[in-house]
């Protein structure tokens, strides 16, 4: 019985450690985003990430790459968080809607 309890405690501690490690890796790092945080050759990969969950992949990629080339910034995540990249957030269409996905 003691071996069972010890094994359970060790597994619980190991599981907790793994969860904490994974959550630290997934944290938002502001120094990785923001105006000028990217080089122009990095836009393709960042836009692929940004547009990964949309059903309108081609237009998303087109406008994301256009915005990234101008702003050198792509917000974190696949949606929202545009406040991190002011240029990306403030570029509007003629109708006043957002130009950047």
UniProtKB/Swiss-Prot annotation:
Which GO biological process annotations does it have? gibberellic acid mediated signaling pathway; response to fructose; response to glucose; response to sucrose
List the subcellular locations: Secreted
Q: Which UniProt keywords apply?
A: Disulfide bond, Gibberellin signaling pathway, Secreted, Signal
Q: Show the disulfide pairing.
A: none
Reply yes or no: does the keyword Secreted apply: yes
Its chief place of residence is secreted
Can you summarize the PTM annotation of this record?
Six disulfide bonds may be present.
Q: Which InterPro entries match?
A: GASA (IPR003854)
Report if keyword Flavoprotein is assigned.
no
* Signal peptide location: 1-23
A Pfam family hit: GASA
Give me the Gene Ontology terms describing cellular component. Answer: extracellular region
Q: Which domain of life is it from?
A: Eukaryota
To which protein family does this belong?
Answer: Belongs to the GASA family.
Its biological purpose is as follows: Gibberellin-regulated protein that may function in hormonal controlled steps of development such as seed germination, flowering and seed maturation.
User: Which protein is depicted?
Assistant: Gibberellin-regulated protein 6
Which source organism does the UniProt entry give? Arabidopsis thaliana (Mouse-ear cress)
């Amino acid at each position: 019985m003691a071996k069972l309890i010890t094994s359970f405690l060790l597994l619980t501690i190991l599981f907790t450690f793994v969860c904490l490690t994974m959550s630290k890796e997934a944290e938002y790092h502001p120094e990785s985003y923001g105006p000028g945080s990217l080089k122009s050759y990095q836009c393709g990969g960042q836009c692929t990430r940004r547009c990964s969950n949309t059903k309108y992949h081609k237009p998303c990629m087109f406008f994301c790459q256009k915005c990234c080339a101008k702003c050198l910034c792509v917000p974190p995540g696949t949606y929202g968080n545009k406040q991190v990249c002011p240029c990306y957030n403030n570029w509007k269409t003629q109708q006043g809607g957002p130009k950047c996905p």
